[in-house]
Amino acid sequence: MTRTVHCRKYNKEMEGLAVPPLPGAKGTELFNSVSKQAWQEWLQHQTMLINEKQLNLMDLTARAYLTEQMEKFLSGADYDQADGYVPK
């Protein structure tokens, strides 16, 4: 049986993640409030941000930026788009 959660991005019951996406309390929070679909969409958006903005994941500032953008993206707030990206 599929696990469901009330997704905070879409504000409805949706299929949940199979495992917490991050370790610790943050991972548990995401596991309980973010749908599988929303998380997959975030991973795609995160990849675009990393590539287009040439972020170095060894840099703590870049990681903090991605965490901030993740919160905005998953909460339905305004979030940064990848410069120069044109959706198909």
UniProtKB/Swiss-Prot annotation:
GO terms for cellular component: cytosol. It holds the Pfam family Iron_traffic. Keywords: Iron. One of its GO terms (biological process) is cellular response to oxidative stress. InterPro entries: Fe_traffick_prot_YggX, Fe_traffick_prot_YggX_sf. Coiled coil: none annotated. GO terms for molecular function: iron ion binding. SUPFAM superfamilies: YggX-like. It comes from the Bacteria. Could be a mediator in iron transactions between iron acquisition and iron-requiring processes, such as synthesis and/or repair of Fe-S clusters in biosynthetic enzymes. Belongs to the Fe(2+)-trafficking protein family. PANTHER family: FE(2+)-TRAFFICKING PROTEIN-RELATED. This is Probable Fe(2+)-trafficking protein. It comes from Teredinibacter turnerae (strain ATCC 39867 / T7901).
